[in-house]
């Protein structure tokens, strides 16, 4: 069941809202467990795919993040950040589109290594870091065919659910958004 109002991303970002709990009635029951999970999505997808998880980098570079991303990260309007977009494939199926925004001030010192992730899942590093703190999860419903997702995944013909969180490593922020794609069926994998 999808909410009565989904969001046309041709012109606007989705309506990101804090997920109150795993019992949040705005979210379909089949999605709640995955969207509210506080652990590593990478680890959970590895288990669900029996270790057959692959990361495909769609793009990585420096750009001005979207308005809501800048707000969450406390970035000035024209401040650039490293933006990385990937698709996580489980059992050779596209399961999750992920977009990470890392401010330049985060990519210093020992965290410079985040510039060189290649095909390594960011979640692997985040959840192994003893300084990692995660802020509350926000969730949103994405309309089919939205334009904020890259063309390789925006041709989906049904609405999808996503979540995002600000993480802090050494008190430095980074944002991770994850959108579950139609080939991912949470009710089969809960």
Indicate where each model-derived feature is located.
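N-terminal domain-onset segments
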Residues: 1-83, 87-89, 93-146, 150-155, ...
